[in-house]
């Protein structure tokens, strides 16, 4: 296919128009007084949101060269979202500012490669300053503050801090759409997996249709159980001890299942059987997790163990087990804390090493189940449009909170970036590298400038006042006052602020050094050609 090529200033201006089209759509959402953007959907109601990355993903421009610029900035927002989960609007605003200032200097004759080196050195210096001044986050109140700022709602902040308190910082917190109007937190304590009882005859509570076992033994195996003789020795020992039993196996069928049900109906002893969770190698790993959590052993031929030789000390224990039609929950397993801790460390190491997003997600689920349970935030709202918007805000706030726990917090409202700009004074560079540093210095003001503009203030006056105030003193756009941001609870995760700047500078520097754009020539006569081709079908009339 034929290509169209543009060079030099024409190429850079086309990219800049695309960058501006996307950035102007996103920047109006920044800050507590930012506006919403309505996104049209082919199916269903339009989506109303103030989430930068969601808006960026929807934008595609007709002009192929302008679209390249828009897609490059979209990459800034997407990468920041992937790394930190929030800060996508800040990253977009920073990228636009660096590109705008950079292109001015390139047009005036500066060397783009020199500017690029200056930008990289400046960003490194600012990131060091952000990391140095980040404060670790410990208290429940601090977690609530971070979540509240990100979501723009104090109630959501409290909900997320409650969830983190209950399931721990490594715990899984999921966000789901609720049926009703209220947004609430539901916590599943202990380990839960998606397998229910094999027969409804095993239930102990007919009202709730669930089986509850108190202080039971747990037999864990990766084998199929078909003959009762395989498990008879261990069953007899459990009956003698007067305890209940949970069997987790690949499957239980035929004579073995019938015998267990018969004993339950006669009241001889209570036993519930469930299938093992997961598939293949993941199933083996999950069975091992359950064994470590409950202090049992997986009966598997890989370890040279046979079902008929199982002894009672190979069985796991737990305070309580709840089994419904679809899931099993193990509460307070009796495993050794040291063993659980080393298993958690091993899974964390696997998470760091894996390159597959799917594997990482599954490993994080396993980690959460071992580390203390799962919290579900159920999002309620009056309309579906409101629910979707609220769900996006909660997901952003959750990601921001995790980032804050990881690397600490800095003053919010764009204040940390203006403070960090002072670190650039120590860089003694010359020529175009010095110009690169000046570009970053100006760009660091842009988020604060935009927050002030969205609140109806003159951005340059606000920036000047914040720069002359002490470190950490910023502009609270909500109360329209200048105050200590951290003391006022206006904080941003250091990881979000750092990632936004690094990703913005990376893409902006690449764009400044672009000299040529190549694109397909849009075909103008596709529709006409197709219709002309169909014209020949008129001759088919003679076939009748």
Curated annotation (Swiss-Prot):
Q: Which GO terms describe its cellular component?
A: cytoplasm
Q: What is its main location?
A: cytoplasm
Reactions catalysed, as given in the entry: ATP + H2O + a folded polypeptide = ADP + phosphate + an unfolded polypeptide
What's its EC? 5.6.1.7
Where does this polypeptide localize?
Cytoplasm
Locate the residues binding ATP: 29-32, 86-90, 413, 476-478, 492
For this protein, the record's InterPro entries field holds: Chaperonin_Cpn60_CS (IPR018370), Cpn60/GroEL (IPR001844), Cpn60/GroEL/TCP-1 (IPR002423), GroEL-like_apical_dom_sf (IPR027409), GROEL-like_equatorial_sf (IPR027413), TCP-1-like_intermed_sf (IPR027410)
What the entry lists under PANTHER family is as follows:
60 KDA HEAT SHOCK PROTEIN, MITOCHONDRIAL
Protein's name according to its UniProt entry: Chaperonin GroEL
């Amino acid at each position: 296919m034929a290509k169209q090529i543009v060079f030099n200033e024409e190429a850079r201006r086309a990219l800049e128009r695309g960058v501006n089209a996307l950035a102007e759509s996103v920047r109006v959402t920044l800050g507590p007084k930012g506006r919403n953007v309505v996104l049209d959907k082919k199916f269903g109601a339009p989506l109303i949101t103030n989430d930068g990355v969601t808006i960026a993903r929807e934008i595609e421009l007709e002009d192929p060269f302008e679209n390249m610029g828009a897609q490059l900035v979209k990459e800034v927002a997407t990468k920041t979202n992937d790394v930190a989960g929030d800060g996508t609007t800040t990253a977009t605003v920073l990228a636009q500012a660096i590109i705008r200032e950079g292109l001015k200097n390139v047009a005036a004759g500066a060397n783009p490669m020199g500017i690029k080196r200056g930008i990289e050195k400046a960003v490194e210096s600012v990131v060091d300053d952000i990391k140095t001044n980040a404060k670790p986050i410990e208290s429940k109140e601090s977690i609530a503050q971070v979540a509240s700022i990100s979501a723009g709602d104090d109630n959501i902040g409290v909900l997320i801090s409650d969830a983190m308190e209950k399931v721990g910082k490594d715990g899984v917190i999921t966000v789901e759409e609720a049926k009703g109007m209220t947004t609430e937190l539901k916590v599943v304590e202990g380990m839960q997996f998606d397998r229910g009882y094999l027969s409804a005859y095993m239930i102990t509570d007919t009202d709730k249709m669930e089986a509850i076992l108190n202080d039971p033994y747990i037999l864990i195996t990766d084998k199929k159980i078909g003959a009762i003789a395989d498990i008879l020795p261990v069953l007899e020992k459990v009956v003698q001890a007067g305890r209940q039993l949970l069997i987790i196996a690949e499957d239980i069928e035929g004579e073995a299942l019938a015998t267990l049900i018969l004993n339950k109906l006669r009241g001889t002893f209570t036993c519930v059987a469930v299938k093992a969770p997961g598939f293949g190698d993941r199933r083996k790993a999950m069975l091992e997790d359950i064994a470590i959590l409950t202090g049992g052993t997986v009966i598997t031929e890989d370890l040279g163990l046979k079902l008929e030789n199982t002894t009672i000390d190979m069985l796991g224990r737990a305070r309580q087990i709840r089994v419904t039609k679809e899931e099993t929950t193990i509460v307070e397993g009796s495993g050794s804390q040291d063993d659980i801790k080393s298993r958690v460390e091993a899974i964390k190491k696997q998470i760091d090493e894996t390159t597959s997003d799917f594997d990482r997600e599954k490993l994080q689920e396993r980690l959460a189940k071992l580390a203390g349970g799962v919290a579900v935030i159920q999002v309620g709202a009056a309309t579906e449009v409101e629910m979707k918007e609220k769900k996006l805000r909660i997901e952003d706030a959750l990601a921001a909170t995790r980032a804050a726990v990881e690397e600490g917090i800095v003053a919010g409202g764009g204040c940390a970036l203006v403070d960090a700009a002072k670190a650039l004074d120590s860089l003694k560079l010359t020529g175009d590298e010095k110009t690169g540093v000046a570009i970053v210095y100006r760009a660091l003001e842009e988020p604060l400038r935009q927050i002030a503009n969205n609140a109806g203030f003159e951005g340059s006056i606000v920036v000047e006042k914040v720069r002359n105030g002490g470190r950490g003193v910023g502009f609270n756009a909500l109360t329209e006052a200048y105050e200590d941001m951290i003391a006022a609870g206006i904080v941003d995760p250091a990881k979000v602020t750092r990632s936004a700047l690094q990703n913005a500078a990376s893409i902006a520097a690449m764009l400044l050094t672009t000299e040529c754009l190549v694109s397909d020539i849009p075909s103008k006569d596709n529709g006409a050609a197709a219709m002309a081709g169909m014209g020949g079908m008129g001759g088919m009339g003679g076939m009748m």
